[in-house]
Swiss-Prot record:
InterPro entries per record: Ribosomal_uL10, Ribosomal_uL10-like_sf, Ribosomal_uL10_bac, Ribosomal_uL10_bac_type
Species of origin: Pelagibacter ubique (strain HTCC1062)
Function: Forms part of the ribosomal stalk, playing a central role in the interaction of the ribosome with GTP-bound translation factors.
The keyword Ribonucleoprotein appears for this protein: yes
Record-given protein name: Large ribosomal subunit protein uL10
GO molecular-function term, one example from the UniProt record: large ribosomal subunit rRNA binding
Length: 166
């Protein structure tokens, strides 16, 4: 990689680290190309960019970003997932890591919060915004449906007691 390419790479990585709400760092040592392609395809379906990094140059790019605390994770065969939805990216990586032990989740950033490996797993178990909304609607609808059932049962009982039905 010549000097100009390195400058472009650093600039692109700085932009990715600054403009994405979620950054997940992984080690992929031992994954085959077909496994990497499969993971990339899953990520791409959700608008997540998954890229293999050049560690030394990436560390230079990290120095000027909110993600500089992740610098120590960039050793060995490292790849990064950039997205605006930490839950989806953590879920995909976590699920893939369960079936492909060569993929290791190292940590990441969600907003301005640094995540360690355990925190990434916790994020993967959180409901997405749509799932949380559906749960909330279900919780709010339950009392109303119970009230309707009680009122209907009461009206049926009242109508069966009326003299017209005798």
């Amino acid at each position: 990689m010549n000097k100009e390419q390195k400058k472009n790479y650093i600039s692109e990585m700085e932009t990715q680290f600054q403009n994405n709400e979620a950054v997940m760092v992984t080690h992929y040592q031992g994954l085959t190309m077909s496994q990497l392609d499969e993971l990339r395809a899953q990520m791409r379906e959700h608008g997540i960019k998954f890229t293999i990094t050049k560690n030394r140059i990436t560390k230079i790019a990290l120095e000027k970003t909110k993600c500089k605390e992740l610098s120590n994770l960039f050793t060995g065969a490292t790849a990064v997932a950039f997205s605006n939805d930490a839950i989806i990216s953590a879920r995909i990586l976590s699920k893939f890591a369960k079936t492909n032990e060569s993929l290791k989740l190292l940590g990441g950033i969600m907003g301005n919060e640094v995540l360690d490996q355990a925190a990434v797993q916790n994020v993967a178990n959180l409901p997405t915004l749509d799932e949380a909304r559906a749960n909330l609607v279900g919780i709010l609808a339950t009392p109303a449906s119970k009230l309707v059932s009680i009122l209907l049962a009461r009206s049926e009982k009242m109508s069966s007691l009326s003299p017209e039905n005798s």
